[in-house]
Regions:
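A charge-rich, low-complexity, intrinsically flexible signal that marks solvent-exposed coils, linkers
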Residues: 2, 30, 34-38, 87, ...
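Acidic, glycine-anchored loop motifs typical of Ca2+
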Residues: 107-109
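N-terminal post-signal-peptidase region of extra-cytosolic proteins
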Residues: 98-103, 112-136, 179-183
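N-terminal Lys/Arg-rich, disordered targeting/topogenic segments
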Residues: 1-34
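An N-terminal structural lobe/cap that precedes and organizes the functional/catalytic core
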Residues: 85-94, 99, 111-116, 147-154, ...
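Ser/Thr/Pro/Gly-rich low-complexity linker/stalk segments immediately outside membranes or between
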Residues: 56-78
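Hydrophobic membrane-insertion alpha-helices, especially the h-region
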Residues: 36-56
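Domain-level detector of nuclease and nuclease-like folds
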Residues: 134, 143-262
Length: 262
């Protein structure tokens, strides 16, 4: 038989705390200073546990009431069309299933990493005249706001990494696990979902969605979230409830934000 559970109210918390204090007073000799401290610690732990249970719910409700999770504008409109799926699984994920850097969709013989570097860096030089391989350049990093001098080499190339705006593992969880190889390879090498970025920021993000990671450069957050929405719309990928709320909270600050063009 199923049972309905409700979250404890503040009155419940207060009553529970009082009852706990009475029990501890009976159990221990409160004339002892050490045991007084112990009583306070026990009560603090109990209250802390109950607050931990209640606060997430309160925070979510406050967000709804204050309009934090309400946004309007072109990007927000597209977000509202995305499927919401909280039953996501990373089982079976393997980065190699997306064939990153294994295709040449435009047939120019250039590696997609070098194509992104050539697009996103300034003052670009190549290892050979007329070639594809980027030797050096300057990145004005959108994630951090830093300016990074890129120089190709075993010890220096990692300063600038190629970032999947919608991470491959997040895509897998959001629907890519059901794709065929051709579609996964297309996604893994789609320039629309690729960005040259600070290596440390890319590593810090990992496979996190907008619910758990946003660029430290606040000026880029609206465009970043809009890009993720654009990618997910293009490939019919879902979002989780938390992810959607995080996106709406960002877009709430920029109602004119559009989906970036390809």
């Amino acid at each position: 038989m199923s049972r309905n559970h409700r979250r404890p109210s503040r009155r419940d918390q207060a009553e529970f705390t009082r009852n706990t204090a009475r029990y501890v007073n009976k159990r221990f000799n409160v004339s002892n200073p050490f045991e007084r401290v112990l009583i306070l610690l026990v009560i603090a732990v109990v209250v802390g546990v109950m607050v931990g249970v209640v606060l997430p719910k309160i925070s979510s409700e406050v967000g709804e009431l204050t309009g934090e999770y309400a946004a309007s504008g072109p990007a927000a409109d597209v977000l509202e069309t995305l499927r919401v799926d909280d039953d996501q699984s990373g089982d079976g994920y393997d980065r190699d299933l997306f064939g990153y850097r294994e295709t040449d969709d435009d047939g120019d013989g250039c590696d997609v990493r070098d194509e992104v570097l050539a697009r996103d860096l300034e003052d670009v030089t190549f290892t050979t005249p007329g070639g594809c391989q980027v030797q050096s350049g300057v990145l004005h990093d959108l994630y951090t706001g830093k300016t990074i001098d890129f120089v190709r080499g075993p010890q220096t190339s990692s300063a600038v990494q190629i970032e999947h705006v919608v991470a491959l593992e997040n895509a897998w969880q959001s629907g890519a696990r059901d794709w065929d190889t051709a579609k996964r390879y297309k996604f893994g090498n789609d320039m629309y979902n690729l960005l040259a970025a600070d290596g440390e920021a890319n590593s810090e993000k990992g496979s996190a969605s907008a619910a758990y990671w946003l660029p430290t450069n606040a000026d880029f957050r609206c465009e970043y979230v809009a890009r993720q929405i654009g990618v997910k719309d293009k490939y019919d990928l879902s979002v989780t409830t938390q992810e959607k709320r995080a996106m709406l909270a960002v877009l709430h600050t920029c109602p004119a934000q559009e989906i970036p063009a390809e």
